[in-house]
Amino acid sequence: MPAFPLLAVDIGNTTTVLGLADASGALTHTWRIRTNREMLPDDLALQLHGLFTLAGAPIPRAAVLSSVAPPVGENYALALKRHFMIDAFAVSAENLPDVTVELDTPGSVGADRLCNLFGAEKYLGGLDYAVVVDFGTSTNFDVVGRGRRFLGGILATGAQVSADALFARAAKLPRITLQAPETAIGKNTVHALQSGLVFGYAEMVDGLLRRIRAELPGEAVAVATGGFSRTVQGICQEIDYYDETLTLRGLVELWASRSEVR
């Protein structure tokens, strides 16, 4: 049986999201911090202890890690081992025997995308397919099938990365907050940029989802997660659900599933 509280850590290129789950699998605490490649294991242990203390949260007894930044994931594992006496489980395609990865090179699939597979299961209902749109440094479209099948997907440039590239190459354009304007037709530079970056990005997401659905042999539910999902909520017409904790919850469910298999 798994030990609780369980610490779930989703390490992205830009942001790291952490959560504590109780014995029912519910997330009782969540945190969102910057991914820092310069922090050593002892630094990370101090940061974790500070997060737990400030929130009045219990110390975890087990941990599961998903990382797309391998050195950072390794440092988290060392921090948990040295200071919390926890052998963290690091997610990969090789250590999930009940998952079928239908890619040319199955071992290349990112750990976060496997977590999204588990997180998407609750949304399948009577359908055989789901698409998770994960808005991060890149925007991932993860296509999964019933029976824990990872079918592939699409990788696109993240909205903030696109905006940063534009600002870097056009010195006279002001840096803006990525939020939806009231109308598509801009009356000033900031408004016009927001329209192009937010509405344009939403149209890309809708268009790619339509293409994915056209290629699948059955209906698919689409679920959005990641920080930028809040910005496009209500704008994207092809997204059915928004779930900011989908990847974390997927980590918890993956851990529980692994414990059941053992």
Swiss-Prot record:
Pathway: Cofactor biosynthesis; coenzyme A biosynthesis; CoA from (R)-pantothenate: step 1/5. Belongs to the type III pantothenate kinase family. Its main location: cytoplasm. Coiled coil: none annotated. It is found in: Cytoplasm. ATP binds at D10, I11, G12, N13, T14, T15, T16, V17, T137. It is an enzyme of class 2 (transferase). This is Type III pantothenate kinase. Substrate binds at G110, A111, D112, R113, T189. The active site is at D112. It comes from Deinococcus radiodurans (strain ATCC 13939 / DSM 20539 / JCM 16871 / CCUG 27074 / LMG 4051 / NBRC 15346 / NCIMB 9279 / VKM B-1422 / R1).
